[in-house]
Amino acid sequence: MGKQGPCYHCGVTSTPLWRNGPPEKPVLCNACGSRWRTKGSLVNYTPLHARAEGDETEIEDHRTQTVMIKGMSLNKKIPKRKPYQENFTVKRANLEFHTGFKRKALDEEASNRSSSGSVVSNSESCAQSNAWDSTFPCKRRTCVGRPKAASSVEKLTKDLYTILQEQQSSCLSGTSEEDLLFENETPMLLGHGSVLMRDPHSGAREEESEASSLLVESSKSSSVHSVKFGGKAMKQEQVKRSKSQVLGRHSSLLCSIDLKDVFNFDEFIENFTEEEQQKLMKLLPQVDSVDRPDSLRSMFESSQFKENLSLFQQLVADGVFETNSSYAKLEDIKTLAKLALSDPNKSHLLESYYMLKRREIEDCVTTTSRVSSLSPSNNNSLVTIERPCESLNQNFSETRGVMRSPKEVMKIRSKHTEENLENSVSSFKPVSCGGPLVFSYEDNDISDQDLLLDVPSNGSFPQAELLNMI
């Protein structure tokens, strides 16, 4: 039967293993039995589980006194580590003392092992190791971070990032990553799926650039423009420029083709969307917009519509809409562009056209044009032309209405002199028995949103389409 407690030395009743002891204490606990085997004596020994607070203090003080060597206490508290530089100032004599002292302690430990045949206890070995570590200056590396050698992948990444930064800094400061630049040199698209044939003449490109720079003044379109995401803005600018180039030169292909093949009822129904048709129908009088589609078909087939198309081709062929001529004024060109879409009997288009042709022939002459009407019932309008040498009154029998204008001053350059002339072809308010046509030209700028306020019946849609092109 195994041994049973309690321990004859400390009085513990439970232990993992009961051990043999000296004859006066035959049964010992695990701790006391281990002490007896290693040291051979139980004098002044109390295991940790049996110590009281007072006994622990006494044993600790006693152990401190036994470790005193040459008046030097080894149980000092571990001092705070001083800066790294102070570790190099330790005197050589102190270093030799600690080295000899440690060697002596190791010799004593070896003798104890040989005499008792076992190792020293855990508590004493820990106390001794702490004592040596606390007094002997240990050499540690500094905490200064050393640069780590970069790998080849990191070097390549850094070089690429540097190149990217240089490229971004070299770019213009006003541009963004989402802006794209397009140069529109040869626009071919006229709109609604139709493609315009180009002029084969060699000088066509120069004429196009001059005409487009002046006719499209309201939209301020240029050959190089910024477009975000290549959206609808670029397409609209191309269409505007193409239309202005078609009208802005006397050699335009509009003069040689049959416009009735382009402006007809079938093309209107086939090529225009429902939204575009509704937008153009707002420009028509109520007579043409109520009974659809018969009213539209009769409008396209009317003789008045065909007459307007032929007159428009004649004006384009004569170069009326070219703004690079020296005798023409920009406001007059814009006015003619609008009048070409109205009834020639109402809009005084012929008078304005003849007036421009006269300026081309006459040089060094100051001309003041005034067109007025005596009353709405009169069928004739009076045009007065004053010259330095003579005065001439000319009556036009085919014009009716009232035409008024504020005085505007324009400089005409001739071969020898530059003189001022007053022009009065900027505001028209014609009235006739054919319909209340009220057309007021107040702004000098023509935009694509200009609407034809009143047009004759059975001849409105193509006129509105031509107005949109201008």
Swiss-Prot record:
Provide the GO MF annotations for this entry: DNA-binding transcription factor activity; sequence-specific DNA binding; zinc ion binding
Tell me the domain of life: Eukaryota
- Compartments it resides in: Nucleus
- The residues covered by the DEUBAD domain are 250-359
**TM region(s), chain numbering:** none
**Mind telling me which GO cellular component terms the entry cites?**
nucleus
Principal place of residence: nucleus
Give the ZnF (GATA-type) ranges. 1-55
Write down a Pfam family by its short name: ASXH
**Which of UniProt's keywords are assigned here?**
DNA-binding, Metal-binding, Nucleus, Transcription, Transcription regulation, Zinc, Zinc-finger
Member of which family? Belongs to the type IV zinc-finger family. Class D subfamily.
> What is the protein name given in its UniProt record?
GATA transcription factor 27
Task: Tell me which species this is from.
Answer: Arabidopsis thaliana (Mouse-ear cress)
Record lineage: Eukaryota, Viridiplantae, Streptophyta, Embryophyta, Tracheophyta
